[in-house]
């Protein structure tokens, strides 16, 4: 689905169903350098169960036009504008990695628009390894390889993708390298490295929140995810064992089950 946000063409996957602004809306926000493609299983599941879904491509990513936004604050404000751009008044948000910072900022800037929040592989701060940041800003493909290596747990390195013929590490690499690396991954990494407001923002959140953490996450470590959850009033925590940072791909079924039965229950009771 294509629509305009601030006059710029924006793409979002609707999970294979026509978008209906009268249904409860869930917006999925991808991580650094990625796109709507990482949410294929999640969007389809909810789209066929009574929800309207938008797995957005942030500006300059995937099939969205424009330049990549340079700060987490800008990205959060942009996600808030998406809600009105599609004719809705409120939404639930699901973010992964950098998308956690973005969705928290969206809640902070647009609290009246957000019903519930799901954070996958999140932390209150995501400082970047200087060498990885340098490689990404130089468009060196090694940055993508390193990110995918660190993002997956041990099991994710040995196959097991739910789609026959696909390999976990290659899926992310294909998405990132669809664009100039420095213009997406480089910009996103720099935005994460510069963002310092996470703890203060998290402490002010007051809405149903679920944190899904990978026990073997090497990018946003388990202990950092727990610290973030502790900052958020009433946050629920689900830990997925034998899983790294890319739980939405590595353990898609467990992740989906957790979101559907734990978190969106709160969404439904508020309707």
Kindly label every feature range from the protein language model.
Residues 8, 13, 40-48, 52-98, ...:
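Active-site loop/oxyanion-hole signature of alpha/beta-hydrolase fold enzymes
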Residues 31-34:
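Active-site glycine-rich loops that stabilize anionic/oxyanionic intermediates
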Residues 104-146:
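Flexible "cap/lid" loop of the alpha/beta hydrolase fold
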Residues 134-204:
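Conserved alpha/beta-hydrolase catalytic His-Asp/Glu region
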Residues 205, 211-213:
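Short beta-strand/loop motif that positions the catalytic acidic residue
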Residues 216-220:
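Acidic catalytic loop of the alpha/beta-hydrolase fold
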Residues 243-252, 256:
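Catalytic histidine-centered segment of alpha/beta-hydrolase-like enzymes
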Residues 262-269:
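Conserved small/polar residues in nucleotide/adenosyl-binding loops
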């Amino acid at each position: 689905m294509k629509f305009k946000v601030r006059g710029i063409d924006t793409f979002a996957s609707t999970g294979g169903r026509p978008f209906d602004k009268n249904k409860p809306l869930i917006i999925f926000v991808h991580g650094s350098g990625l796109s709507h493609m990482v949410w294929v299983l999640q969007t389809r599941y909810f789209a066929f169960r009574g929800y309207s879904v938008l797995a957005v491509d942030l500006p300059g990513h995937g099939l969205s036009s424009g330049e990549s936004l340079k700060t987490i604050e800008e990205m959060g404000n942009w996600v808030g504008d998406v809600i009105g751009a599609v004719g809705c008044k409120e939404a639930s948000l699901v973010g992964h990695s950098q998308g956690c910072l973005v969705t928290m900022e969206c809640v902070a800037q647009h609290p009246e628009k957000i019903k519930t929040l799901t954070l996958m592989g999140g932390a209150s701060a995501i400082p970047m390894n200087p060498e990885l940041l340098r490689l990404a800003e130089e468009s060196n493909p090694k940055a993508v390889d390193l990110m995918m290596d660190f993002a997956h747990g041990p099991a994710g390195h040995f196959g097991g993708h739910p789609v026959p013929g696909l390999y976990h590490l290659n899926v992310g690499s294909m998405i990132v390298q669809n664009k100039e690396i420095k213009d997406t991954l480089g910009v996103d990494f720099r935005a994460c490295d510069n963002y310092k407001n996470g703890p203060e923002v998290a402490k002010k959140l007051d809405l149903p929140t679920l944190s899904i953490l990978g026990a073997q996450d090497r990018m946003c470590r388990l202990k950092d995810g727990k610290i973030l959850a502790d900052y958020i009033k009433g946050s629920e925590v689900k830990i997925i064992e034998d899983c790294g940072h890319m739980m939405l791909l590595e353990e898609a079924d467990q992740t989906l089950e957790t979101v559907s039965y734990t978190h969106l229950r709160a969404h439904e009771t508020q309707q």
